Amino acid sequence: MAAFRDIEEVSQGLLSLLGANRAEAQQRRLLGRHEQVVERLLETQDGAEKQLREILTMEKEVAQSLLNAKEQVHQGGVELQQLEAGLQEAGEEDTRLKASLLQLTRELEELKEIEADLERQEKEVDEDTTVTIPSAVYVAQLYHQVSKIEWDYECEPGMVKGIHHGPSVAQPIHLDSTQLSRKFISDYLWSLVDTEW
């Protein structure tokens, strides 16, 4: 603004010079002053242009920084969505694993119960093999020696089959327990036993 005031002052001086028809010295002085004002104006203009270029450069840098920041925010949003999706998947997987663990725990408990039951049965079998089976084998051998009957254990259910090895001949046994009473079958088998033994 000061430069424009100086120009206005110089212009008024020139007008007064022309109007008053003053001396040449005053004209030179005013022309010199006019040149100084023009130089100052040009310097000011150069400075203003330089400042304007700097401001434009700064604006471009700020705009680029803003664009970079927006891109980073966008990338951050995408990464956040990916992390949230991953977190949701991890939560679902955790739920599936917990359900699977619960199922496996139940199965383990069932297996432990089965194992305990098997151990109990094994103990009972051990008792049977040490006490019951030897005595049953002894009784079966005794019955075989007394009755001389060789049993067919592979016959169909409900049938009593075997061979009685009597004193003179072997006689087949073929009885249907669904049509005959137990008493009849027992009496018949005992009737085969030789009384002279």
Curated annotation (Swiss-Prot):
Gene3D superfamilies: Ncd80 complex, Spc24 subunit. Residues 132-197 are annotated as: Interaction with the C-terminus of SPBC25. GO terms for cellular component: cytosol; kinetochore; Ndc80 complex; nucleolus; nucleoplasm; outer kinetochore. One of its GO terms (biological process) is attachment of spindle microtubules to kinetochore. CDD domains: RWD_Spc24. The modification Phosphoserine is found at S11. It holds the Pfam family Spc24. Residues 33-131 form a coiled coil. Its main location: nucleus. Signal peptide: none annotated. The keyword Lyase does not apply. Residues 1-69 are annotated as: Interaction with the NDC80-CDCA1 subcomplex. It comes from the Eukaryota. Keywords: Cell cycle, Cell division, Centromere, Chromosome, Coiled coil, Kinetochore, Mitosis, Nucleus, Phosphoprotein. It is found in: Nucleus; Chromosome, Centromere, Kinetochore. Residues 1-131 are annotated as: Interaction with the N-terminus of SPBC25. Belongs to the SPC24 family. Acts as a component of the essential kinetochore-associated NDC80 complex, which is required for chromosome segregation and spindle checkpoint activity. Required for kinetochore integrity and the organization of stable microtubule binding sites in the outer plate of the kinetochore. The NDC80 complex synergistically enhances the affinity of the SKA1 complex for microtubules and may allow the NDC80 complex to track depolymerizing microtubules. Component of the NDC80 complex, which consists of NDC80/HEC1, CDCA1, SPBC24 and SPBC25. The NDC80 complex is formed by two subcomplexes composed of NDC80/HEC1-CDCA1 and SPBC24-SPBC25. Each subcomplex is formed by parallel interactions through the coiled-coil domains of individual subunits. Formation of a tetrameric complex is mediated by interactions between the C-terminal regions of both subunits of the NDC80/HEC1-CDCA1 subcomplex and the N-terminal regions of both subunits of the SPBC24-SPBC25 complex. PANTHER family: KINETOCHORE PROTEIN SPC24 (PTHR22142:SF2), PTHR22142. This is Kinetochore protein Spc24. It comes from Homo sapiens.
